């Protein structure tokens, strides 16, 4: 079973697309050498990013929409 579960993570974000973007950006940071915010048994950046989100270490803020033109 995958930990943390998708159900657990979906309660923390507004959509699955936000979850994917958040995890991908954090995984990229980890690959670039940024410090892990949680201890993990995994060495995979995406798994570590999802564990950080589940632990409440990652946050996001929705930006204001801008007018087109």
From Swiss-Prot:
It is an enzyme of class 2 (transferase). InterPro entries: DNA-dir_RNA_pol_omega, Pol_omega/Rpo6/RPB6, RPB6/omega-like_sf. It catalyses: RNA(n) + a ribonucleoside 5'-triphosphate = RNA(n+1) + diphosphate. One of its GO terms (molecular function) is DNA-directed RNA polymerase activity. Its EC number is 2.7.7.6. The keyword Nucleotidyltransferase applies. GO terms for cellular component: DNA-directed RNA polymerase complex. The keyword Transferase applies. Pfam families: RNA_pol_Rpb6 (PF01192). Keywords: DNA-directed RNA polymerase, Nucleotidyltransferase, Transcription, Transferase. GO terms for biological process: DNA-templated transcription. NCBIfam families: rpoZ. HAMAP family: RNApol_bact_RpoZ. Promotes RNA polymerase assembly. Latches the N- and C-terminal regions of the beta' subunit thereby facilitating its interaction with the beta and alpha subunits. Belongs to the RNA polymerase subunit omega family. This is DNA-directed RNA polymerase subunit omega. It comes from Symbiobacterium thermophilum (strain DSM 24528 / JCM 14929 / IAM 14863 / T).
